[in-house]
Amino acid sequence: MIPAALLLAACAAPVPPLAQGLPLGITPASDQAFDERVQSRFPPGSAADVLVSELRREHFVIVGHEFTKDYELSASRSRESFPCKDTWRVYWNIKDDKISALKGTYSLVCL
């Protein structure tokens, strides 16, 4: 008989390609590693449409913000694997069709 936890883990959605190979868990290193990956793949000054296309391809949900001072746009993708939920977020600003500011965050919440 297969344990229920093993079956649930096997059903979890995959990690998005942008985060593959990075540490997961509740540590500052996990959040920092995702931010560094985002910064290296889409450095400020690069074309914003490339970032948006990649995030959409990876099934991130993109949202515009008028209420935040720091970033105009964000995208998030979550992966639920009971009892936990991983969430990756990317925040950015655009000026003249280029990324002017960028930040990636990762979080893990468990019951």
Q: Residue ranges of each PLM-predicted region?
A:
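A cross-family detector of function-defining hotspots
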Residues: S53-W88
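C-terminal motif of bacterial Sec signal peptides marking the signal peptidase cleavage site
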Residues: L8-A10
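Terminal, regulation- and interaction-focused segments at domain boundaries
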Residues: L18-S53, E58
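Sec-dependent signal peptide recognition
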Residues: M1-A4
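Cys/His-rich zinc-coordinating "finger/knuckle" motifs
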Residues: L18, F67, Y91
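Bacterial signal peptide processing site
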Residues: A12-V15
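Amphipathic N-proximal alpha-helical interface segments
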Residues: E80-V109
